[in-house]
A protein has these predicted regions:
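N-proximal low-complexity "stem/linker" segments adjacent to membrane-targeting elements
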Residues: 1-23
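A conserved acidic beta->alpha catalytic loop
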Residues: 37-46, 96
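Short beta-strand/loop segment that forms part of the nucleotide-sugar
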Residues: 21, 30-40, 62-63, 92
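Catalytic donor-sugar/metal-binding loop of nucleotide-sugar-dependent glycosyltransferases
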Residues: 152-153, 176-180, 189-206
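Cell-envelope/extracellular polymer assembly enzymes that use nucleotide-activated donors
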Residues: 3-5, 32, 187
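Acidic helix N-cap motif at the loop->helix transition within catalytic regions
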Residues: 15-19, 42-51
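Terminal low-complexity segments of carbohydrate-biosynthetic enzymes
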Residues: 3-5, 101, 108, 112, ...
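Acceptor/aglycone-binding surface of glycosyltransferases and processive sugar-polymer synthases
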Residues: 62-83, 88, 100-182, 209-226
Length: 240
C-alpha cells in the first residue's frame, strides 16, 4: 500500500485541530498526519499530544520554537516525510478551508499520472465561499499576474491544498527555496513546472475558516508579488 502523509501546519488552531485530524483519519486509505506546530500559545500542541495516545502510529508532530512561517513549516515537513519513506505528501490547512473529503481526489490524480495535484479554486471559474469580494478579486488577479509573468499554465498559483509524489520533493533543492509566506506556494509550483514534472489542477470549493483567526496579511501578498519577479530571473536546478 502507498504510504501517504498529510502535513498540517498550525499556529493557534485549538478550535480546529482535533476535528481536522479526526476528519482525515476517517478517510479510507490509511492516511497519516504530520502536524508542524509553531509554538501556539493556545494549547494546540497539547491537544495533538493527547490525540497521539489514541493514534500512536499515524499521528506525528514536530514542535518548533516560535512562528517561523508557512514555507519553513512545509519544508520541514517535506524533509521529514521523504526521510520517513512516504510516497505521497499532502499540504492542507487546519481550518477546514480545504475539505478533507477532497484529499482522495488529489491522491487519485497523482495515481493517474500527475506528479503534483493542486486543489484549485480557479480552474473552473471562481469557487470560493465566505471571502469578501475584494479578497476574491485580489487573489484571482494575483494568480493571473503570476501565470502571466512566469508562463506557468496553472490557474490557482497560490493554492495551498496539494499532493506531491515523493520524486518531486526529492528533486527540488528544498534548501534553496527562498520564499516563506504564500509566495512559497508559487515558488514550489514553479520549481515543479520548470523541472519538467506534470501538474494537474483538481477543482475544489474553498470555504474560508469559520473558527480561529486568519493568518493572511498584506506582507504575505507583498512577498508573493515582488518575489515572482526574482523567481522569473532565477535558474531552477535539481538537487545534486
Amino acid at each position: 500500500m502507498d504510504r501517504k502523509v498529510v502535513i498540517i501546519p498550525t499556529y493557534n488552531e485549538k478550535e480546529n485541530i482535533e476535528k481536522i485530524i479526526r476528519a482525515v483519519f476517517a478517510l479510507e486509505g490509511g492516511y497519516h498526519i504530520l502536524v508542524i506546530e509553531d509554538g501556539s500559545p493556545d494549547g494546540t500542541a497539547d491537544i495533538v499530544k493527547n490525540m497521539q495516545k489514541e493514534f500512536p502510529e499515524s499521528l506525528h508532530m514536530i514542535e518548533r520554537k516560535g512562528k517561523l512561517g508557512l514555507g519553513t513549516a512545509y519544508i520541514t515537513g517535506f524533509k521529514w516525510s521523504v526521510d520517513n519513506g512516504y510516497d505521497y505528501i499532502f499540504e492542507m490547512d487546519a481550518d477546514f478551508s480545504h475539505n478533507p473529503n477532497d484529499v482522495p481526489r488529489l491522491y487519485q490524480a497523482c495515481k493517474d499520472g500527475a506528479d503534483l495535484a493542486i486543489g484549485s479554486r480557479y480552474c473552473n471559474g471562481i469557487s470560493v465561499i465566505n471571502w469578501p469580494i475584494g479578497r476574491v478579486i485580489m487573489s484571482y488577479y494575483a494568480s493571473v499576474y503570476v501565470r502571466t509573468v512566469l508562463g506557468m499554465k496553472v490557474y490557482d498559483t497560490t493554492a495551498g491544498f496539494k499532493c506531491y509524489r515523493r520524486q518531486v520533493l526529492e528533486t527540488i533543492d528544498l534548501d534553496k527555496v527562498k520564499m516563506k509566506g504564500y509566495g512559497f506556494q508559487i515558488e514550489m509550483k514553479y520549481s515543479t513546472y520548470k523541472l519538467g514534472f506534470k501538474i494537474q489542477e483538481v477543482p475544489i470549493i474553498f470555504v474560508d475558516r469559520t473558527e480561529g483567526t486568519s493568518k493572511m496579511s498584506s506582507g504575505i501578498f507583498g512577498e508573493a508579488f515582488w518575489g515572482v519577479m526574482g523567481l522569473k530571473m532565477r535558474k531552477i536546478k535539481p538537487r545534486k
